[in-house]
Amino acid sequence: MPGGLYRTIVGADALAYGLVAGANLVGLKLVLGSYPITPASSLLHVLAGMKEFGVTTFQAEDEISAVCCAIGASYAGSLGVTSSSGPGIALKTEAIGLAVSTELPLVILNSQRSGPSTGMPTKTEQSDLYQAVYGRNADSPVPVLAASSPADAFDTAIEAVRIATKYMTPVFLLTDSYIINAAEPWLIPDVSSLPQDKVEFCTAADADGFHPFLRDEETLARVWALPGTPGLEHRIGGLEKDYDSGNISYDPENHHRMTMVRKAKIDGIANDIPKQAVTLGSEEDAVAVVGWGSTYG
């Protein structure tokens, strides 16, 4: 192991520290909207004890309220986060589609367990990958990340926050019952070495020609304007928007254009992440076996 100061860390703690660090690195307050479910409840418990780091936690009456709370927090200028396991994610899918449509940053944590339905709540399983990638109506692309170990959850959480805010998109972060409950040595990082990418909100100086779906030429992310900013009054929602004005549109050609730009935005994230390296064997070998999450090795 590399030299440095280590401590034993549980996956839930690493996730919480990573989310708090990620929010701090982009200059946002963290708001968690969650509803208890095994094995994801431990993250809610840990973050609820982090008020001194500017964390707000809201235990909602159900999964739908929890994710909608997180979306509302992001609309208001915070980092919205929601957490659950497979059955709860199933209930959140319509609201996650709303976050795709409104193009708001949202980090969605799924601590996977055995299914289907109630399944085996206390047993681990990596069975929600397709749910994360495809589990919404229509064309609703989102990036999906997976932690490979309890310690790796810290770095993966920071990366999820970075991508969500840079590209104005919901991001799935997959763990499982093993990762969130297991413990391992964690190399405490040098905070000064962590990547800082502060969010820049639109200001009153940007009012001329403003609409909420103006886009960055490189990332295709839309602009982020806080409600109540003078001259930046706007509306966003689940109805399709006109590409050139942000107004509601039922035009089929415009819908195709918006569908393709949302897809291109997510596809472009591939240019912003490191290329994957061979863990065992050689790049010259004939067969590649791809692992991910807690079985990546």
Task: Put a short name on every predicted segment.
Residues 115-117, 152-153, 180-183:
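Short, well-ordered, mixed-charge alpha-helical segments that flank or form enzyme active sites
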Residues 139-162:
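Active-site/ligand-binding-proximal alpha/beta "capping" segment
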